Amino acid sequence: MVSKECCRNEIRAAIRQLSDRCLYSAAKWAGEQLVGIEQDPSNFTPANTRFQRGSSSIRRRFSTNESISTPLPSVGFSQAATPLPEEDEAIDGDIYLLAKSYFDCREYRRASHMLRDQVSKKSLFLRYYALYLAGEKRKEEEMIELEGPLGKSDAINRELVSLERDLSALRRTGAIDSFGLYLYGVVLKEKGNESLARASLVESVNSYPWNWSAWSELQSLCTSIEILNSLNLNNHWMKEFFLGNAYQELRMHTESLAKYEYLQGIFSFSNYIQAQTAKAQYSLREFDQVEIMFEELLRNDPYRVEDMDLYSNVLYAKEACAALSYLAHKVFLTDKYRPESCCIIGNYYSLKGQHEKAVMYFRRALKLNKKYLSAWTLMGHEYVEMKNTPAAIDAYRRAVDINPTDYRAWYGLGQAYEMMGMPFYALHYFRKSIFFLPNDSRLWIAMAKCYQTEQLYMLEEAIKCYKRAVNCTDTEGIALNQLAKLHQKLGRNEEAAYYFEKDLERMDAEGLEGPNMFEALVFLATHFKNHKKFEEAEVYCTRLLDYSGPEKEKAKSLLRGIRMAQTGFPSMDLEHFPI
């Protein structure tokens, strides 16, 4: 593996280069990784140890997970020093400094105009980047002015055509560098030319691998493992960060966790890696672990807002109202106009059953970021709770437009159409959700219920779905109970008995009671009595005697029947049974 000192030197140089080009998000990400590198003990000072307190407990606790393979071998990492673009060797010109000042003040067109006669690659990048952001700014203004229901509008970035033309010409002549290639890839992606966009972004990260923004854009274009594997990427430690993120988005969570475990060998105190690990654990539904990790993350970085929306989802799922209330109050005081903050507050109101207020905050999040996927999906859920299915469908469709591989939005569409009594449509959307997440029992159960509706009534298909749900570890036990009932309905009593016994074993192991247990005990007692397996039947009847009311009377009736079947005479005395 590349040395820590080598990584540290590369990142320090990259932060300066990224900041010089106003790529502030990439510079911030790089800075977070810089302080995430474990310091040499000989260099410990109060200044450089402050960022590395407290994280080690989580790192030790979760760096080795049973589901993770052994750390990846240290193969082929580039250890060359950061190449210094030629323009960085000289002092920036006066015009560039003024243009950068305009850019920092969000006067993008003014910055672009100031650089109109500059020919250096650095100046060309900032000129066209400023023009791109000027177009984005105007697009956002038009979206507010022209928006229709749920914020729909036809606003576009009107600079994309000229940007594509100019950047394409500059690329052909070799007049742009890796940063220009990154911008060219972004423009091509916006125009829907994904293949060329990937090629441009790959060229960019291969020539300058420290621009996290370029890696992020490339990851968003890797919608399948086949596309990811087809990329011709140079070996570099930044590639490992990219693959960890890409695997996570492709729902390859074990592989993603393995990458992050490997990277922790150098970036031992990286809050980013800890947050990404928590995301993967969340997808694996390890909510208790995720909660601990986010609590530790907030202790180390108390004013952090990014990724806290995921933490709020965990607290929502665990119905931890007090903790969610505290988190919502905290982010409100920190930065209430961040999309993540609005989403967290929306989750809080949703948990309290105040769905109108929740929708208001999800809408506010979308005002701040129209492409905020979670807000569209969560708003759809709220509309489902409010029985406003047309609005729910609209919200879910917006989520699908942003990310066609988001299983939650497809699942939401299925639920909405199911509520409207349109099982054929619901089935289509449930199938789409299962395509993107085939190992989730909840999706198979939803599709099975669709097959059970009166309009479809395809019980054999429902049985297949419930069997898949059982294989996907149905923690709620819905599938086993339904399999037993469906086989009973179809007159397959042997199969029904098998699944009732399995369900009973599950409930006993979990210490559960309730109607499902009573139903299973009655069926099994009756089934074994009818098959003259009286000892087994008595066992289930005896368990039924522990109930009170109608259940106990049912048990007595069954025991009388068993006694009569055994002796051939009516039983007049049940005192020998533990009633």
UniProtKB/Swiss-Prot annotation:
Component of the anaphase promoting complex/cyclosome (APC/C), a cell cycle-regulated E3 ubiquitin-protein ligase complex that controls progression through mitosis and the G1 phase of the cell cycle. The APC/C complex controls several key steps in the cell cycle by mediating ubiquitination and subsequent degradation of target proteins such as cyclins. The APC/C complex is required for the female gametophyte development and is involved in several aspect of development by controlling cell division and cell elongation. Involved in the control of endoreduplication. GO terms for biological process: cell division; protein ubiquitination; regulation of defense response. The APC/C is composed of at least 10 subunits. Interacts with APC2. TPR repeats lie at residues 237-270, 272-304, 339-372, 374-406, 408-440, 442-476, 477-510, 518-551. Pathway: Protein modification; protein ubiquitination. It comes from Arabidopsis thaliana. Keywords: Cell cycle, Cell division, Mitosis, Nucleus, Repeat, TPR repeat, Ubl conjugation pathway. This is Anaphase-promoting complex subunit 8. Belongs to the APC8/CDC23 family. It is found in: Nucleus. One of its GO terms (cellular component) is anaphase-promoting complex.
